[in-house]
Every structure is written in C-alpha cells, then in structure tokens.
Amino acid sequence: MSTKIDGKQIAAEIKTNLAERVNRLKAQGIQPGLGTLLVGEDPGSMKYVAGKHADCQEVGITSVKKELPADASFDDIAATVRELNEDPACTGFIVQLPLPKGINENAIIDMIDPAKDADGMHPYNLGELVLHVRGDISTPLPCTPRGVLELLDAYDIDLNGKEVCVLGRGITIGRTIGLMLTRNAVNATVTLCHTGTRDVADHMRRADVIVAAMGSAGFVTPDKIKDGAVLVDVGISRVYDEEAGRYRIKGDVDKACYDKASAYTPNPGGVGPMTRAMLLANVVEMAERHA
C-alpha cells in the first residue's frame, strides 16, 4: 500500500517548533519579523501573501506589509525594497512575484539584502548553495526545494544513491532542487528534464523518485513510472471543472499513479504547506543568527 505524505501535518509540526524558538528569541529581546512587498491586486498573489501573514501570527512573527499599486514604477518598487532592507522590524522579506509587466524582476531581487532574503533566491544566496557541496549552509535556502527535502526526511525516505528525475528547470524549484539533491549530505543522482529533453518517459521510468514541477496537469501517468517510485508533485495548474462550473487546482501527477507508487505527495496539501513553513523557518533562522 502506498503512503500519503502529509505536508499539512509536517508543516504544522514545524510551525509548533518555530513558535517555541520565537518565544526563546523574544525572551532575549529579539522579535522576528517577515516583510512582504505586494505590487498590484492579483487575486492569487493577494491570497498567498495573506496566507503568509496568517502563518506569521500563528507562530508569533511580526508582519511588515508593503503594498504598491499595479502602475508603480521600477523606482517606486526599488525604494520600497530599500525601506525593507533598512527596517529593523523586518528580519527577512519577500517580493511577491510576478511583478507587473515591464518591471525587471531580476533587478529588483538583486536589490534585496542577501541577509534578509527570506525566499533564498538572491544571487548571492544561490551562489552559496552552488559553492557549498559539503558542510552546513548558513545562508537562506529556497523555500520549496527545502520543503521537499524536509518532507521526505520526515517520512524517512533515504535519497542516498537514489535516481531522482526532476521535471522542470525553473529556478524556483527545478534547478535549485537539483543543487540541493546533489549535495554530499543528500547524495542523490539527479536527471533534470526540460522541454529539450528527449524521451522524458524513459528517464521517469528509471527514477526511484520523481519531482514534478512542470505546471502540466496530469503529465505523470502510471505508464511513465516504475513500481514503488516516490512521487513529489510540485506542479500547479488551474483546470476548469465543467461539473462544478469552476476552476480547480491540479498537480502534475495523475492520481491514478498513487497505487503504483510507494509514497506520494497529494496536490494540494503536500508541498505547498511546506513551502510556507520553510519561509517562516528562514525568517526565524535569520533572527537566530543575530541572537
């Protein structure tokens, strides 16, 4: 029987631990704070940011909210990033993406103080990840890849020497999780598949673990996986449900795969809660470094 990897449960346990650590920091006169910069009124982004601040309240982290209109200029956004860099109440912060069309997102991310980069996506922090194949990393790690590894570890899924097929080469998940999986502490062998990969299904069938991060609903089907594979579903697609008359979130993994797998993350309810928990963990760890 396959094991359902419950991201909600593990994230809740992590948040309980974080709340205890926040209380210890407060006893030392240190108050962790998460800042968010939201530009525009995209419903998805607004919901996501609201969820992050609800998480903050749950563990005792201060919320620092910055909002700009959709027509904000590059200079307006840059000035707000500088404010967050200098705000002592903000231990770490994120710029909610995507930014409005025409704004250079990479240039904005470059302006974030690496020590306050709660998403772990600043070029300096990514460079630290590339350089440190062995030993501990003291800089923030990308939230979703970190969440995936924490989730698998919580279920005692050993990746040492395992063949891992990563579907998707985006910087948020695909490329960064490849770096983390190949660190000496994890020691997996990674195949990174993308739009230029030939015979993707052949790579998938050889894999002990598949990390699907394509955003292609139901791409991973039973005929493309081997018996006993571990399936990590990170992809998100909005698919219209004609019966319900509304859109639903669907992952990259077809649910028909679950019986063939040894373990799987549901979507939603698998990796998503862990991403949010890792954002909080990054903020708490930033505060602990200054304790």
From Swiss-Prot:
Reaction catalysed?
Answer: (6R)-5,10-methylene-5,6,7,8-tetrahydrofolate + NADP(+) = (6R)-5,10-methenyltetrahydrofolate + NADPH; (6R)-5,10-methenyltetrahydrofolate + H2O = (6R)-10-formyltetrahydrofolate + H(+)
Provide this UniProt record's keywords sorted from A to Z: Amino-acid biosynthesis, Histidine biosynthesis, Hydrolase, Methionine biosynthesis, Multifunctional enzyme, NADP, One-carbon metabolism, Oxidoreductase, Purine biosynthesis
Q: Which domain of life is it from?
A: Bacteria
Q: Which GO terms describe its cellular component?
A: cytosol
EC assignment: the record states 1.5.1.5, 3.5.4.9
Q: Name one GO biological process term.
A: methionine biosynthetic process
Q: InterPro entries, alphabetically?
A: Aminoacid_DH-like_N_sf, NAD(P)-bd_dom_sf, THF_DH/CycHdrlase, THF_DH/CycHdrlase_cat_dom, THF_DH/CycHdrlase_NAD-bd_dom
> Which pathway is this protein engaged in?
One-carbon metabolism; tetrahydrofolate interconversion
SUPFAM superfamilies named among the record's database cross-references: Aminoacid dehydrogenase-like, N-terminal domain, NAD(P)-binding Rossmann-fold domains
Q: Where does NADP(+) bind?
A: G168, R169, G170, T195, I236
Gene Ontology MF term list: methenyltetrahydrofolate cyclohydrolase activity; methylenetetrahydrofolate dehydrogenase (NADP+) activity
Q: Which Pfam families does this chain map to?
A: THF_DHG_CYH, THF_DHG_CYH_C
Subunit structure comment from the entry = Homodimer.
Q: What role is this protein assigned?
A: Catalyzes the oxidation of 5,10-methylenetetrahydrofolate to 5,10-methenyltetrahydrofolate and then the hydrolysis of 5,10-methenyltetrahydrofolate to 10-formyltetrahydrofolate.
Similarity section: Belongs to the tetrahydrofolate dehydrogenase/cyclohydrolase family.
Listed name of the protein: Bifunctional protein FolD
Q: Print the organism lineage.
A: Bacteria, Bacillati, Actinomycetota, Actinomycetes, Bifidobacteriales
